Amino acid sequence: MALLNFIDKQFNLCVGALFCTVSILVFISPIALQPDSLGYIDVWFNRTPVYPLFVNTVLAIFGDYYKTALKVLQLLLGLASVWFFITQLRKHISLQTFWYLLLTGILLIPYVYNHKIANNILTEAIAYPLYLLTTAHFLLFFFKEHTKNLSYALIFLFILLLTRKQFLYFVPIGLVILFWVSYKSKTFKRNIPHLIVLVLLPFVVSLTDSTYHKIVHGHFTNTPWTGIHLLAPAMYVADKEDVAIYTSEEEKAYFNAIYTEIEENNFNEAAAISEGQDVISHYIANFAKIANGTIYPIGKERYEKELSEDDALIKVDETTTAMAIPLIKDNFKKWLSLYIKNFSYGFENSKYVLLFVILFLFGISKINVSNTNRFKAIAFVTCVTISNIAIVAVGMHTLKRFTFYNDWVLFFVIFILLNSISTHYIAKRKTHL
């Protein structure tokens, strides 16, 4: 009890101690270069704009000391975003301070364990802080129904989407909240400008992305990598006869080249089944080998004979995008089965999928009762968790690198529910005294 009272009175001091501990652990670890890091440092064509610009700005200012500067700046961005996120939640959701201290520690875990995002030159280093800020402002708009908070959310979301496009699901979720707020407060006309901005945001992001590549790489096009990731799961479940769905000789030749290599290396679903392996584990283990190690190099080799390196990458992206949709349609049941398994893998198992769906429906069912911020928060954070994994599962393997952004959500919901039970129990005891 004394500890809880101390935390309650000295919350800022306790958070400061957590921040100092995390900072020490980050500073004593060197910054690491991952296989993807060079693409951001050298501003590769297949990288979205924000993080390469961030890295190269730091490189231009700090020169040989850029790694240390990156580590410090990435840590500071993280600490600032966590602090803002926690302080805003404390203002609008009444929980015991102890729960918020625990939540702060959980939000800081990606900086000291497993991902160590401040110590890596990867998009996660700034995507995570941007994600927390975007989430916080959407929650504030949901709580307070002030369009100022929505404006801030859209600004951070714009930057976030130019860092990692997997967060596009915030747009439909934002539209639903905006319609709900407008209906509830009868402010449809007043909210039309924000509605227009939300609808146009994906197009503005696409235009900005293309403009960036025109300025930096000389090509007015979106970051060319989408088609490769869309085609990879479709190729995993394909069979040799699927070449017949294509009418273009170019697409037929590309399909045959990809399929032959995948089959020879046992990267496809048929190999997993014949070897008695778990399909989703086999897919997760081989996704990068299919996408980055097979589809891309085969296309690169084919098209670089006649095109420049950048033009060849654009051609690969266009061709793989065109090939993906017909192949998915032709094998839709198998593709859908793989998608569902990949989606469930992102939650670790299907029971957690069911749990998150139940929690989401619970939150939605309670948003019209008194003290709704708790239930709005439950509905929103479970919805973004489900949406994130749902969109990642379409064209990626659902590794923690792409799903860790919401690892805190289940803890947060449990803290809300435990606090509610505790508060109800204490109130009930007082009435019997």
Stretches with model-predicted labels:
Residues 26-68, 222, 316, 332:
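Extracytoplasmic catalytic/substrate-binding loops of multi-pass membrane glycan-assembly enzymes
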Residues 68-77, 306-386:
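Membrane-interface anchor segments at the N-terminal boundary of transmembrane helices
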Residues 72-94, 129-137:
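Transmembrane-helix motifs of polytopic, lipid-linked glycan transferases
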Residues 73, 113-138, 160-170, 402-407:
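Multi-pass, polyprenyl lipid-linked donor-dependent membrane glycosyltransferases
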Residues 85-110, 128-129, 148-152, 379:
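Transmembrane-helix signature of polytopic, membrane-embedded enzymes
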Residues 126-143, 152-157, 175, 409-413:
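Specific aromatic-rich, kink-prone transmembrane helix
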Residues 150-164, 201-204, 209:
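Membrane-interface alpha helices of multi-pass inner-membrane proteins
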Residues 222-330:
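Membrane-proximal stem/loop segments at transmembrane-domain junctions that anchor or position
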